[in-house]
Design a protein with these regions (language model features):
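Short aromatic-glycine-(Arg/Gly/Cys) micro-motifs in beta-strand/loop hairpins
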Residues: 2-21
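A short, exposed loop/beta-hairpin motif centered on an aromatic-Gly-Thr core
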Residues: 19-32
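Short, charged, surface-exposed hinge/linker loops at domain edges
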Residues: 1-7, 36-62
């Protein structure tokens, strides 16, 4: 299983998810979508099956 750190910040009406190891980011409309959006981004970027992607919440800024 691949594990990645994420940093999440509030940006207006969106949540911005930063994935430092990949130098990328994605956005979620609702907090409940953050984990899925991060895992999807990582899976696509690394060509790893989504069920093999784990995330570690490093920082969450409201």
């Amino acid at each position: 299983m691949s594990s990645f750190d994420i940093d999440v910040t509030r940006d207006g009406g969106w949540w911005t998810v930063h994935i430092p190891e990949l130098g990328g980011q994605t956005r979620a409309r609702y907090p409940r979508e953050v984990e899925l959006m991060a895992r999807e981004y990582i899976a696509i970027s690394t060509r790893t099956p989504i069920d093999q992607v784990a995330i570690n919440w490093r920082r969450r800024t409201l």
